[in-house]
């Protein structure tokens, strides 16, 4: 049980971008550079882990909840990952839920629609 504070590593967290109209750029997903985010690792009394990545404005950009017994230390394997995307005024614009993150990582989503800031595929709600 406890809390650890670390920094992110290169290639660990997607840095989602918005275009000039505030729409999510789905064709470009660079990563945050090493040390750009604070990585807060919380372990509960049962040994379950939650990892939050916060930017310099203290906004949570990624929250990973342990989904398997032995999740990978870095990346998304074994985690239920949720991304939070903010506009230039720090307003939360999009939430990418765990199932959508899985489909994105598998390459199964090439286009998005959104409804109320939640990402949808063109034919299925994720």
Regions found by a protein language model. Name each.
Residues 1-126:
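Beta-strand elements of repeat-based all-beta scaffolds
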């Amino acid at each position: 049980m406890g809390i650890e504070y670390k920094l992110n590593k290169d290639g660990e967290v997607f840095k989602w971008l918005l275009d000039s109209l505030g729409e999510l750029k789905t064709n470009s997903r660079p990563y945050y550079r090493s040390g750009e985010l604070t990585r807060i690792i919380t372990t509960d009394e049962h040994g379950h882990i939650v990892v939050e990545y916060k930017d310099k404005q203290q906004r949570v950009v990624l929250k990973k909840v342990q989904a398997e017994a032995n999740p990978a230390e870095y990346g998304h394997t074994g985690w239920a990952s949720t991304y939070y995307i903010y506009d230039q005024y720090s307003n939360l614009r999009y939430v990418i839920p765990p199932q959508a993150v899985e489909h994105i990582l598998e390459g199964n989503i090439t286009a998005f629609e959104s409804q109320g800031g939640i990402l949808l595929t063109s034919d299925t709600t994720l």
